[in-house]
Amino acid sequence: MSFSYTGFFLQYHAHITYFWRMVLTAELLSPNLMQLFIQTGWLEWCGVFTGILCVWLAAKNNIYNWPIAIVSVVIYLFIFFDSKLYADMGLQVYFLIMNAYGWYFWNKTKNATHERPVSTITSKEILLSAAGIVVFTYGLGTFLYKNTDASFPFVDSFCTACSLIAQLFLARKVLQNWLIWIFVDIIYVGVYISKDLYATALMYALYIYIAAVGYLNWRKTYREQNN
């Protein structure tokens, strides 16, 4: 089994360019592409709906994002296994744990005298996160490349590593979690198009917008806290 970074990124660029051209020119309504969405299974549509809803609620600082997120990650456990995106499948297990933690953490602070404030990332957290992403990507990517038939083992592992950090920061109400999500979601759009998961790719395209809204909302809250 061989893996070519050049081949992947050329393919990724072609897919992502085509996808956004269709979105921006309303070609999503063309018969051929509509047929692709029609062929999308009901399970993926359920994952898309719950995924978008939970991220939108998180952007609005709403605690009910967590139980809906739990439903979404369980659905995507099965979807990613079927698509041989094993790093993403493993990521859902982590998300399941972190969603339960986030639900508990937010509920605990909600019931306290003061709501948990939005915080910003520290220099130490940046260094530790960067180091963790590099080590995790190399370790998991190498394992998947040598031992499985995973699609895009290193790219998938890199996105998984970034997502681990972003999810932890989301649960801890760190403002910059949204910037990490924007970066990762842009990559994920191309990956999922490459695997013919068009509804999921569209969901992640919407995630980019929602993450931008979330960042602006949380930044406003952070500034109000410090005035």
Question: What positions do the PLM features span?
Answer:
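Membrane-interface helix caps and helix-loop-helix hairpins in membrane proteins
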Residues: F81-D88, F143-S151, A171-V174, I193-Y198
